[in-house]
Design a protein with these regions (language model features):
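Extended, non-transmembrane interaction/recognition domains
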Residues: 1-311
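Mature, structured domains enriched in cysteine- and short glycine motifs
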Residues: 302-337
Length: 337
């Protein structure tokens, strides 16, 4: 924030505000995006010589861990755990180098450098030591595109170069306020027909009492969903569930939010208010089967003629006869009864 008495002074984001960013790019952006925002609304339009981006979203608070713990307070298996789990991980050491001999352990964020499963392993080890709480939760508003090596061997449907798509463009975006998130876009599980995304973080805010509430947003072009699921052009329905480490569904305080942009090209979903430590977000897309209209009954070429025939009774003495015809007449010697 630039003011008369400050120069680029860093301030926290005010609560309950959204921010809009409009940018013009000389080249088209494509691929998958990752964001640290909430409830994003993205409009991308082609302009002469490039693209125009109009992005509106709210910032999110990302829990961080940065604790110094006396070595004497660490678990008895710390040395063994460190050898097995940390030596080949982040470059930053675990010990506070300002003391000699080293008497404190510096516990940093369990970043995703070793993959989400490794990071969750670190987090699960730290949480009982630090009280399962964040040291801080600074506000962040950021969106970036993922490099090819960050796509985590994801489906080719997320690739802008997929031959099914008419043009190269952004295929979608995933955002969350979790400390740890899956690499790349949600993974498609062909067996469950679901899009899965792993997140993790401490249960509590800095005070150790207030639950930290999670956010998750998924924006995806409809043609990407059709590519993943083999859908037709019929309408697509979506649902989000949150599964904890025990395989049980978590009830979020704010349920699924579906928002449609003006162009109708995007599927936009969100889930908010869930708690940690390591829930898995599961999105299921479904499509109603299109029922073919019943074939019209074949009309007979033969015209249906209405019957104009009549029946009369003719008698001759004790003999009677019934005569049927269009214009029936009694035979000679008979008279009409």
């Amino acid at each position: 924030i630039e003011e008369d008495s400050f120069c680029m002074n860093q301030r926290a984001f005010p609560a309950d505000l959204t921010y809009q960013v409009v940018i013009r790019l000389r080249t088209s952006t494509n691929g998958w995006l990752f964001g640290r925002v909430q409830k994003p609304d993205v409009v991308i339009t082609s302009i002469p010589g490039g693209e125009k981006w109009d992005v509106t979203a709210a910032p999110v608070r990302i829990p961080q861990i940065w604790e110094f713990v006396p070595l004497t307070s660490m678990p008895k298996d710390f040395a063994e755990w460190k050898t097995k789990n940390w030596e080949s991980a982040p470059s930053s050491g675990l010990f506070d180098k300002s003391t000699s001999p080293q008497t404190e352990v510096r516990i940093p964020n369990p970043l995703n450098t070793g993959g989400v499963d490794t990071a969750i392993n670190w987090l699960n080890y730290w949480m009982p030591i630090t009280g399962d709480k964040a040291t801080a939760a600074p506000g962040v508003w950021s969106i970036r595109n993922l490099a090819p090596n960050e796509m985590n061997n994801s489906s080719s449907c997320y690739d802008s170069n997929n031959a099914q798509y008419k043009e190269k463009r952004v295929t979608g975006m995933v955002t969350s306020n979790a400390m740890i998130t899956s690499a790349g876009p949600p993974q498609f599980d062909a067996k469950d027909q679901s899009l899965n995304y792993q997140v993790a973080g401490p249960h509590f805010e800095k005070d150790g009492k207030t639950l930290f509430r999670g956010t998750y947003d998924l924006i995806m072009r409809k043609d990407v969903a059709r590519c993943l699921y083999g859908f037709t052009d019929a309408p697509i329905k979506a649902s989000i569930s949150i599964i904890n480490a025990n395989g049980e569904e978590i009830i979020a305080t704010e349920q699924i939010a579906e928002r449609n942009n003006a162009s109708g090209e995007w599927i936009t979903l969100g889930k908010y208010g869930f708690t940690f430590s390591s829930p898995r977000l599961r999105v299921k897309l479904t499509q109603e089967k299109v029922v073919a209209p019943a074939a019209n009954p074949v009309q007979s070429n033969k015209s249906v003629m209405k019957s104009n025939k009549a029946t009369i009774t003719c008698i001759k003495g004790k003999i009677s006869k019934k005569i049927t015809g269009v214009n029936p007449k009694c035979p000679s010697g008979f008279r009409k009864k």
